[in-house]
A protein has these predicted regions:
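Charge-dense, helix-prone N-terminal extensions
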Residues: 1-120
């Protein structure tokens, strides 16, 4: 999967928008981060220049299981490690699993918006 295929998949989910929220930070890596939102909440982000991994939200028990199963799943970069995983492209996580994990992350955020005060 390449960055454009990944972006198209994320944007195919209902109500998803995208934004590069860090245009003025000092480090280049963070400036190139593209976040995918449902409502006003992130469910996934990726560096569009390096395209080495995506960071996705997971249930805590799922995060632990995925890290044990795949070398390409690590604790989430710059995120709460209990709920977020970095999933590396072109390692041992098949593209079909990456898409499923993105969809699960999306559903988690949609559920949390419905339960809480987050706008959809």
């Amino acid at each position: 999967m390449n960055v454009e295929e990944f972006r198209e998949y994320c944007l195919s989910l209902p109500g998803v928008s995208e934004k590069m929220p860090f245009p003025n930070v000092a480090d280049r890596y963070s400036r190139d981060v593209l976040c995918f939102y449902v409502g006003d909440k992130w469910f996934c982000f990726v560096n569009i220049e390096v395209f080495d991994f995506c960071c996705i939200k997971c249930r805590p028990e799922e995060s632990t299981e995925l890290r044990a199963r795949y070398e390409g799943v690590k604790p989430g970069w710059h995120m709460n490690k209990k709920y977020w995983n970095s999933v590396y492209f072109n390692q041992d996580v098949p593209d079909s699993i990456i898409r499923e994990l993105v969809a699960r992350s999306y559903r988690l955020v949609v559920e949390s918006c419905r339960e809480g005060a987050g706008a959809l």
